[in-house]
A protein has these predicted regions:
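ABC-family P-loop ATPase nucleotide-binding domain
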Residues: 1-5, 10-40, 250-255
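ABC family nucleotide-binding domain
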Residues: 30-244
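H-loop (His-switch) and adjacent beta-strand-loop-beta switch element
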Residues: 241-253
């Protein structure tokens, strides 16, 4: 029964087999390349260099943990990679698209098609059900409601979370909200998912379940996920661990 499957996956480390690979997941080219990224803020005579010549290349199917002290620019880097913020200097290529060659008016469409976002505060819309929240990126992109809801249902089924379809966010636990947010990030089959402290407000059981889901998505679906985190469990299970300090990005040794 579906309800039984939900209970097993929401609290544990195993779940149903995820859906078929997106054909582009077999493409050997990097899904994300950032070259000489600078983000500088100037206020009067003060110049604050948040990112200083960051270079990054990410292959499809990698789960990349971005670590570092608070206030070192990890979220800023994620925002630049996801085209939420323009770099002062540098280039980002996402799924073969030169992101910042597009005018501002086109960046929203690019983000909606190519990037799935998951944040510490999951920003589910309180007036809509779980199913409607997950379908929202498709509805915003103009997909017919019936088709969008159908696709959202498929994604929720894939991750083993169909027992709360008609519930609203206020009726969900923190872990359930996190799973709904991850499903919403997946619904467009994005090129990359960018997650900013997604386990930050979760208890240990819910955090472990979300980490397990991210690992399964990268290994079984070849989904590319970059996650800013202070959670050691995420770092321990990531494909790669990057460290950001003083505006510079370095890679930790394989573990």
């Amino acid at each position: 029964m579906k309800g039984q499957r939900d209970r097993g996956t929401e609290g544990g480390s195993t779940g149903p087999a995820l859906g078929p690979l997106n054909p582009r997941s077999l493409d050997p080219s990097p899904v994300l390349q950032a070259t000489d990224i600078w983000r500088v803020f100037e206020t009067g005579a003060e110049r604050l260099e948040i990112l200083r010549g960051v270079d990054l290349e990410v292959q499809r199917g990698q789960l990349v943990a971005i670590l570092g002290p608070s206030g070192t620019g990890k979220s800023t880097l994620l925002h630049v990679l996801g085209a939420l913020d323009r770099p002062t200097k540098g280039r980002v290529v996402l799924d073969s698209l030169d992101v910042f060659s597009y005018p501002e008016s086109k960046l929203h469409e690019l983000r909606n098609r190519k990037v799935g976002f998951v944040f510490q505060f999951h920003h589910l819309l309180s007036e809509f059900t779980v199913l409607e929240n997950v379908a929202m990126p498709l509805l915003v992109a103009g997909m017919a409601r019936t088709e969008a809801l159908g696709r959202a249902h498929e994604v929720l089924e894939e991750i083993g979370f169909v027992s709360r379809l008609t519930h609203r966010p206020a009726e969900l636990s923190g872990g359930e909200q996190a799973r709904a947010a991850m499903a919403r990030a997946l619904v467009n089959e994005p090129a990359v998912i960018l997650a900013d402290e997604p386990t930050g407000n979760l208890d240990s059981t819910s955090a472990a379940a979300l980490v397990d889901l991210m690992v399964r998505l990268s290994s079984e679906r070849k989904m590319t996920i970059l996650v800013v985190t202070h959670n050691q469990a995420v770092a321990d299970r990531a494909t790669r661990r990057l460290h950001l300090a003083e505006g510079k990005l370095s890679e930790e040794a394989n573990h």
